[in-house]
Curated annotation (Swiss-Prot):
Superkingdom field: Bacteria
Main location: cytoplasm
Reactions this protein catalyses: UDP-N-acetyl-alpha-D-muramate + NADP(+) = UDP-N-acetyl-3-O-(1-carboxyvinyl)-alpha-D-glucosamine + NADPH + H(+)
Compartment list: Cytoplasm
Cofactor(s) named in the record: FAD
GO MF annotations in UniProt: FAD binding; UDP-N-acetylmuramate dehydrogenase activity
Enzyme class of the recorded protein, top EC level: oxidoreductase
Annotated catalytic residues: 176, 256 (proton donor), 357
Organism, scientific name: Corynebacterium glutamicum (strain ATCC 13032 / DSM 20300 / JCM 1318 / BCRC 11384 / CCUG 27702 / LMG 3730 / NBRC 12168 / NCIMB 10025 / NRRL B-2784 / 534)
Organism placement in taxonomy: Bacteria, Bacillati, Actinomycetota, Actinomycetes, Mycobacteriales
Protein name stated in the entry: UDP-N-acetylenolpyruvoylglucosamine reductase 2
FAD-binding PCMH-type domain segment(s): 31-198
SUPFAM superfamilies: FAD-binding/transporter-associated domain-like (SSF56176), Uridine diphospho-N-Acetylenolpyruvylglucosamine reductase, MurB, C-terminal domain (SSF56194)
Pathway(s) served: Cell wall biogenesis; peptidoglycan biosynthesis
Amino acid sequence: MDSSLAQEIAAIDGVELDSEVTFADLTTLRIGGKPRSAVRCQTTEALVSAIKLLDDASLPLLIVGGGSNLVVADGDLDVIAVIIETDDVSINLTDGLLTADAGAVWDDVVHLSVDAGLGGIECLSGIPGSAGATPVQNVGAYGTEVSDVLTRVQLLDRTTHQVSWVDASELDLSYRYSNLKFTNRAVVLAIELQLLTDGLSAPLRFGELGRRLAISEAEPHPRRPVRMVRDAVLELRRAKGMVVEHTDHDTWSAGSFFTNPIVDPALADAVFEKVGEPTMPRFPAGDGKEKLSAAWLIERAGFKKGHPGAGAKASLSTKHTLALTNRGDARASDLVALAKEIRDGVLETFGVTLVPEPVWIGISIDD
């Protein structure tokens, strides 16, 4: 941006210009080159004002929250990084409504809700990133999705630069998807969640978490105290390297890298016949489809934890095959090569195409 525009943006209360930051600093993968410039916004008003000025100048923007769902190319990038640092969270204990600014750390939001005795998002504990990203990809884990509790989102329309609250029903929310994903038409400014007020979790599914909580398959609509569920989820995620720890390279990742594939029953049957394991995970996915486990497919295609082994710059986590990790000095090209190897290996073995979950900036899995 030219100096006059930079001065105008810097004059906005709550804005700080940053000429040194890289995307390696801004993402949980710790990979990525340098933006043309970066604009840090500490208030919603500052965020709206800065984006309007930058849009009016027709500059390419990348809106960055927690950086947990980004794969960014190496080198210098012709983009302005707008970093959302708004972090207010408000809770109405009477009706269970929680409102969070887009820049609030998601796990802090979950922690606050649990401390307040509110249920509904405890299964989403430990997920990295910001609150504003959760509706964009409809974040989910252990049988819970943000769409289960999301009532509305506050959006900045990038065309009109008007701010409005939009009902969750207008977002086309589905498995790891909303109509905000892969588009620059709007920026999430805040989210509103309707939570439960009786101190218990949302109904839990039997499975890994259910076994940890001693839930029986025969127990109808099981619920547990929210803190008990949060603690169990964090234990499970830490064991898989899915809670960010700066000293643990298994957590230098974008979380679950591939979505669980939704396939026709005939393809699921073919996978079952090929592997012959009676415990193959497969679940109803609606519309006559079935959901398979991406991690299970990766392992059965011959890719073990830690693949391709010690010394690799990018590898599968040593704790969980669904996380692609930076072992310390990986470049974007290293991660792309690994992602392509995994995707192509599963396709060749099972005929199932794995779809990456992160957003790609300046690079793609086919590069």
